[in-house]
Amino acid sequence: MKLSFHGQSTIYFEGNGKKVIVDPFISGNDKCDLDEQTLDVDYIILTHGHADHFGDVVELANRNHATVIGSAELQGYLSTYHGVEDVHGMNIGGKAKFDFGSVKYVQAFHSSSFTHEDGIPVYLGMPMGLILEVEGKTIYHMGDTGLFSDMKLIAERHPVDVCFVPIGDNFTMGIDDASYAINEFVKPKISVPVHYNTFPLIEQDPQQFKDAVHEGEVQILEPGESVSF
């Protein structure tokens, strides 16, 4: 199986012949190598509603007639205000099966809203992490989160093959907490650092994260590069 990284927290993969993207922050993201006007997807999965994760979901969903998976509140917002027709609302602890595999939402410590042009934020449900089971593999996309001890419980319940872990600090875990999460709680086979170097406030050296991790393998990906396992 192959998972490709496209800047910030955007991940693309194919499962059982279906094309899936997570947190499609494409336009307005100089670190992303994708083109939202030509990208072909069947499913879009969202961890929360912040602009650097919500991204181009409306354009992609409406042009591709793709199914959008996310919090119930976020799905209601997309269908009511943006005409997105195929939405699947979920919440923390819930699991659902799709053509490509299954999605289970787990806890994340963060916030979730979308700010309109008038500057007023709209509450879009709880922020969440993802447990994806695809073609016999388990992927943990942490979303945006601080460190919390139940990461250990999540990994005990779902032994992780690949973990996408935010390291940018300021808004999420930094390198110290992210490496602790991997070494002490999650212990995946492969870790991939995400959510860094997109903006000045989250500039980090991913090599420092790699040097601090002693559980499993760390793969540092440039936008467009993939991890295969």
Swiss-Prot record:
SUPFAM superfamilies given in the database record: Metallo-hydrolase/oxidoreductase
Keywords: Hydrolase
GO molecular function, one term: hydrolase activity
Keyword Plastid: no
Family in the record: Belongs to the UPF0173 family.
UniProt name for this protein: UPF0173 metal-dependent hydrolase SH1218
